[in-house]
Amino acid sequence: MSNLHINGRTVAVDVDEDTPLLWVIRDVVGLTGTKFGCGIGMCGACTVHVGGRPTRSCITAVGAVGDAEVTTIEGLDPNGRHPLQKAWVNLQVPQCGYCQSGQIMQAAVLLRDFPTPTDQDIDGVMTGNLCRCMTYLRIRKAIKQAAVEMREQANG
């Protein structure tokens, strides 16, 4: 039995330490927004934040998380109204939607590190998150729209 700090709360989980974090999040904790895509950490659909860093949860053992805070798409904003989530809806980014939680989680770290991202910044940080529907131009536009809203919120 170990404790997992997820989305601001502590959850006791009884799993082997080598169990992928993805399956603990989905099957044990019951948060299904994080998706299984490839199982080898190459597509980004399973991206969550561990200690504030984007992490591929399908290849991260729950034992490797330790006491770090895990944030999933459900924890990005308690009401689902993070500027990225609003921009995704406003610009109708998803087609099938399967990769989108991972895209948004990666983009959240991008905007933390690059509050005014260039196309080059976006492409560089988002390159490992694959979208089989090829909505990359809408993703870029949504990231830029969210960046504007986040700067406006920061400036009051």
What are these regions (language model features)?
Residues 1-156:
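Signature of N-terminal electron-transfer/Fe-S-associated modules in redox systems
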